[in-house]
């Protein structure tokens, strides 16, 4: 078998170390891929697949992309979940003896991509590491583009899923135990677009992980990191750090802190709630417009936009912390002139978090440094305005916001105002910063004059009128003479090249000038790059100062945004209580009111507490506004705990540890679950995980099955939630089962509300107003008419509905609820884990019932009226005796 060529041997040796990656192998001006990598890349990138002689009989499949456009191709592969290893030439091909030395300089994965063109500036690009050990989860999260690095430990899988949905990482790495734990990885991959890799066991070696962390953060014990009580969390953070060091091939000096956090510090929001409340994107279009974030986000910087998203996704549950934020928003709302001045200064500020990452990683170009400098120029006036602010949180921002004047002065003195993007082009260093640079520049510029004079002198000496001095990279400087003047060329001209219409020559004097000029250029470019690198390293050494300032700027941006939104939208400051009371006067849906023109949104009140107003049963027709009202209540509660002002006349918000929503459902065909199964799974999750401090938003429980089953389930859920020994959570419960309104008065903490409707003959007008009491009609036929159902169907539906009646069901509900209420008063109510065989359920039918059997046997056609009355009387007495 023929041997591989030396180049291909080098490729195969490198590829063997990165078998899970597509290897981008640098060859001149291209990155080439071979064999399986070429087949994959050509398919995914839709580029031509060719072949290359590799020393064997068959040519190796090959494709390639130009180096100057590599990021676009790389990003496309990474977005599809591939890892890409970048193998560069690490020595000058001119100096190489044999094959040019090459090394993998970085590995790009979905969670480690640093290309700003590929990243959304308003979102973090998180990578998460999950370790499952002894029924506990260690979770660490990092965004290497911003320097964020967190760690926590979780007791169960449900909390883990909440964290995954909260951070929405683009990549998860994990140990094999987690990968095989039965967690729904397919959902994470397909629905959330997360790439998941299981790493080898050595990544999770306890001793190695601890050593890596102590070494990176330069501490002697985990007490210095606040991690002395963490076990699997430390393993997770250490494994993640190891993975990042391997992929980035640098020191990760922008990861300056590992912050432990406790999930109990924040309101818990599961994936269903995040979707249903449309916190950061809409349910259907997956767009920001139409979400809560869209309403609140008036930030001026990328850092501020990311921080606001974190606020919305992680509401607080500490009253003091919430009020600190509200104090900041209130002062900035009142100080409108100062606020708008701050916002003007924030507008030119670039993304300092990601800029300092590029600087520390050595990938920042000269334009990045001028962007950095122009951002720093905005800091002194911002500090000047902040100094006058009174509230503690704004004063803390003032203290943290370092003006970084030394770094601003350095860049101003060292770097030209508009330098080129490419460092190899020179013209980076400002005049006067370095004497040697100025001297070499004079040589370079004077050299052009020297060349022009030499050209003129040679024309006069030789009489060759069109003689020109030119330059190319192959021959350097040369004299070009057209064939028509070839006879006038003197003897001291040495011919270098013959063209079709001209000859190219060199002279001793031109060679001397060339050496002087090109030598000066080479020295100048090398010196400029050296000085530029020194400036970059000086800035990188101050990474902690810069990151601290960036976070201060981001926080200030968020609070000025929230203050502006509060002013423009006529929001009010909510009062925060720990008594479990939610009292909203004239509340409005923050998003819907922005979508409706001319201030047409109808406001509504809400009152819930832990005693007699625990559950509000809301009835009314479809399209009347039940779902909007319930979502609005949840959003107002959430906004208050974020630290926002809220859309209401007044709001007193009791702290909620969690908000749950069960709003709408659809078949999950991929997992084989029907609408009803999806709904019941969500209900089960709520009943298992909610607490008495939770806020529940339940819409149309039980609608996916038969009327009797659905009503039974809805009723049982209301009873369960209302019982403080079982759950006792504040709840808004919308339903089409009007029969449930009979529970008011029977269950002491249940109250009825409905959406007001005005009837005009057969037509209805939705008033959108919540009023006390239950709806006595569903108005389904009228809604069908509004939807455009044909008149023939509408008229037939009216005929049928007159023949059907819900009175029997309603009276039965009332009867059973009353009996339960009486039993509870007498101390005879049954627990949920007991069975009262004597008590008939709502729709029980007894197969061997003698009354039913007698009814079946009656010959109605031969029964006289008197016999019929007597039979009816006898059967009625039997039933009365039974009850």
Regions found by a protein language model. Name each.
Residues 1-331, 347-360, 364-456, 802, ...:
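Charged catalytic and DNA/RNA-contacting regions of genome-maintenance
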């Amino acid at each position: 078998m023929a041997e591989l060529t030396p180049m291909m041997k080098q490729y195969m040796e490198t590829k063997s170390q990165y078998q899970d990656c597509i290897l981008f192998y640098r060859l001149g001006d291209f990155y080439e891929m071979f064999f399986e990598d070429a087949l994959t890349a050509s398919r995914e990138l839709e580029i031509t697949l060719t072949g290359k002689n590799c020393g064997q009989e068959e040519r190796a499949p090959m494709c390639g992309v130009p180096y100057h456009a590599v990021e676009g191709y790389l990003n496309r592969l990474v977005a599809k979940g591939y890892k890409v290893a970048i193998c560069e030439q690490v020595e000058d091909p001119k100096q190489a003896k044999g094959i040019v030395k090459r090394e993998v300089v970085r590995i790009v994965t979905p969670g480690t991509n640093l290309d700003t063109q590929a990243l959304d500036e308003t979102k973090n690009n998180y990578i998460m590491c999950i370790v499952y050990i002894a029924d506990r989860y260690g979770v660490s999260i990092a965004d290497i583009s911003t320097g964020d690095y967190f760690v926590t430990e979780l007791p169960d899988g449900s909390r883990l899923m909440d964290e995954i949905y909260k951070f929405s990482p683009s990549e998860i790495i994990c140990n094999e135990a987690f990968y095989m734990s039965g967690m729904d990885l397919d959902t994470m991959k397909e629905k959330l677009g997360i790439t998941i890799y299981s790493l080898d066991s050595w990544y999770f070696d306890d001793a190695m992980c601890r050593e890596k962390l102590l070494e990176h953060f330069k501490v002697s014990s985990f007490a210095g990191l606040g991690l002395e009580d963490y076990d699997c969390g430390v393993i997770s953070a250490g494994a993640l750090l190891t993975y990042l060091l391997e992929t980035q091939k640098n020191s990760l000096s922008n990861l300056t802190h590992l912050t432990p956090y406790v999930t109990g510090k924040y309101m818990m929001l599961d994936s269903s709630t995040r979707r249903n409340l449309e916190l950061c994107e809409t349910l259907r279009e997956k767009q920001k417009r139409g979400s809560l974030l869209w309403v609140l986000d008036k930030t001026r910087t990328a850092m501020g936009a990311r921080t606001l998203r974190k606020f919305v996704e992680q509401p607080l549950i500490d009253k003091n912390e919430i009020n600190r934020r509200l104090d900041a928003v209130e002062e900035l709302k009142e100080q409108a002139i100062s606020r708008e001045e701050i916002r003007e200064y924030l507008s030119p500020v670039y993304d300092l978090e990601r800029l300092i990452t590029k600087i520390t990683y050595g990938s920042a170009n000269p334009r990045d440094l001028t962007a950095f400098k122009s951002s720093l120029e905005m800091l002194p006036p911002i500090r000047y305005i902040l100094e006058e602010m009174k509230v503690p949180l704004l004063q803390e921002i003032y203290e943290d916001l370092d003006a970084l004047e030394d770094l601003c002065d350095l860049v101003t003195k060292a770097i030209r105002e508009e330098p080129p993007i490419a460092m190899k082009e020179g013209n980076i260093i400002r005049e006067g910063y370095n004497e040697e640079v100025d001297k070499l520049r004079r040589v370079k510029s004077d050299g052009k004059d020297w060349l022009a004079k030499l050209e003129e002198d040679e024309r006069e000496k030789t009489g060759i009128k069109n003689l020109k001095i030119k330059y190319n990279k192959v021959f350097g400087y040369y004299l070009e003479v057209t064939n028509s003047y070839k006879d006038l060329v003197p003897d001291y001209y040495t011919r270098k090249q013959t063209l079709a219409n001209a000859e190219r020559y060199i002279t001793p004097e031109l060679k001397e000038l060339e050496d002087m000029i090109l030598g000066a250029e080479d020295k100048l470019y090398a010196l400029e790059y050296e000085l530029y690198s020194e400036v970059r390293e000086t800035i990188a050494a101050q990474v902690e100062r810069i990151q601290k300032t960036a976070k201060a700027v981001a926080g200030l941006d968020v609070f000025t945004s929230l203050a502006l939104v509060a002013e423009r939208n006529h929001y009010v400051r909510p009062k925060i209580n720990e008594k479990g009371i939610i009292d909203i006067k004239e509340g409005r849906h923050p998003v819907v009111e922005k979508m409706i023109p001319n201030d047409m949104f109808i406001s509504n009140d809400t009152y819930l507490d832990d005693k007699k107003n625990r559950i509000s049963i809301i009835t009314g027709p479809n399209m009347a506004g039940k779902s909007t009202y319930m979502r609005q209540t949840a959003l107002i509660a959430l906004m208050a705990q974020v630290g926002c002002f809220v859309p209401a006349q007044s709001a007193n918000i009791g702290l909620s540890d969690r908000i749950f929503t069960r709003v709408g459902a659809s078949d999950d065909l991929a997992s084989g679950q029907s609408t009803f199964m999806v709904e019941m799974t969500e209900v089960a999750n709520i009943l298992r995980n909610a607490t008495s401090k939770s806020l529940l938003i339940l819409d149309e429980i039980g609608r996916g099955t038969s009327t009797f089953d659905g009503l039974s389930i809805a009723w049982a859920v209301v009873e369960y939630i209302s019982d403080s020994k079982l759950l006792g959570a504040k709840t808004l419960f919308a339903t089409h089962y009007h029969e449930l309104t009979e529970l008011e008065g029977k269950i002491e903490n249940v109250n009825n509300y409905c959406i007001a409707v005005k009837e005009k003959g057969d037509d209805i007008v939705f008033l959108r107003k919540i009023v006390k009491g239950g709806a006595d009609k569903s108005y389904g036929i009228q809604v069908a008419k509004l939807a455009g159902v044909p008149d023939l169907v509408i008229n037939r539906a009216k005929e049928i509905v007159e023949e059907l009646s819900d009175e029997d069901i309603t009276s039965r509900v009332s009867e059973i609820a009353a009996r339960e209420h009486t039993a509870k008063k007498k101390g005879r109510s049954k627990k949920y884990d007991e069975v009262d065989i004597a008590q008939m359920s709502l729709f029980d039918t007894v197969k061997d019932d003698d009354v039913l059997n007698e009814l079946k046997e009656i010959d109605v056609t031969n029964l006289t009226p008197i016999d019929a009355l007597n039979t009816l009387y006898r059967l009625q007495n039997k039933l009365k005796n039974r009850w």
